[in-house]
């Protein structure tokens, strides 16, 4: 049976440094979920666990230095509403040296967390500038980071891989993005998708990154996730909304992707 979107697992509050929207409060986020008739929404502000040593290079310290647990926990306790779950989580980065910005102990206190391996605009923190400059470099780093991440002992049942495709991966250029996605294809990606499926980690379909004006790029993205589906991966949807206007496109874009992939309930990652 056709899957109808019933959740949004990637939402930032005004507390995320790249938001700054005073109207993007937990109460507003919950109301959005209620208005959409969702079964669940997740608050996932950018976060670096202060108990995890941060590599002191590039973009990271300036961005993450103040986005620690005392900062993101200012949103607690989350408001509640009958009929919808409101999950407390975070979005964390994996750096170029393989450090994931959250400890297992902190993960135990959260309902859900997103791990990004593809914030490739954060040069010299998540990727070396010389690797970010070419499709070949980005493709290699994406595969290397995914392979390493999947060796870690983590509570995969409540973790999602954020925006594996999109402008963070492709630099905002459709042709460049398509070339990166072409280069990651192959037996290695198949192996990694199968391992991700076996571990039970969710794969995000990030509706903020779907660009439907370029047919070649859209098809490349659909093909990438169709391959993940063939390998047994399960998916969740995230608007990546940083401001109120980020909510407006989520259902329509997500449903288009769900239909393109032929998703059913069996393909959906649940927390």
What are these regions (language model features)?
Residues 36-40, 109, 155-160, 262-264:
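Short loop/turn motifs at secondary-structure junctions
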Residues 1-15, 26, 31, 174-271:
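Charged catalytic cores and adjacent phosphate/nucleic-acid-binding surfaces used
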Residues 48, 112-195, 199-214:
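Divalent metal-binding pocket/active-site signature
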Residues 91, 166, 270:
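Residues that form or immediately flank small-molecule/cofactor binding pockets and catalytic motifs
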Residues 65-81, 85, 105, 134-160, ...:
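Histidine/acidic residue-rich metal-binding segments in metalloenzymes
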Residues 2-140, 144, 244-248:
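A metal-dependent hydrolase metal-coordination microenvironment
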């Amino acid at each position: 049976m056709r899957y109808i979107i019933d959740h949004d697992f990637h939402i930032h509050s005004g507390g995320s440094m790249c938001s700054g929207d005073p109207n993007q409060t937990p109460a507003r986020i919950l109301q959005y979920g209620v208005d959409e008739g969702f079964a669940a929404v997740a608050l996932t502000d950018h976060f670096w666990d202060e108990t995890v040593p941060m590599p002191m290079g590039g973009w990271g310290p300036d961005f993450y230095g103040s986005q620690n647990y005392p900062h993101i926990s200012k949103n607690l306790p989350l408001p509640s509403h009958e009929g919808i779950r409101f999950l407390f989580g975070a979005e964390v980065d994996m750096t170029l040296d393989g450090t994931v910005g959250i400890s297992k102990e902190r993960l135990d206190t959260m309902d859900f967390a997103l791990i990004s391996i593809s914030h490739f605009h954060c040069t010299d923190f998540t990727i070396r500038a010389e690797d970010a400059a070419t499709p070949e470099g980005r493709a290699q780093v994406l595969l290397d980071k995914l392979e390493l991440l999947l060796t870690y002992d983590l509570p995969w049942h409540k973790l999602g891989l954020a925006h594996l495709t999109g402008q963070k991966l492709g630099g905002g250029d459709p042709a460049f993005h398509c070339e990166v996605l072409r280069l990651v294809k192959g037996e290695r990606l198949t192996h990694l998708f199968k391992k991700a499926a076996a571990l039970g980690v969710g794969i995000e379909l990030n509706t903020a990154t779907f660009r439907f004006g370029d047919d070649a790029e859209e098809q490349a993205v659909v093909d990438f996730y169709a391959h993940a589906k063939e390998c047994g991966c399960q998916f969740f949807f995230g608007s990546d909304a940083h401001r109120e206007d980020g909510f407006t496109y989520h259902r329509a874009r997500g449903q288009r992707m769900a239909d393109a992939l032929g998703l059913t309930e069996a393909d959906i990652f649940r927390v």
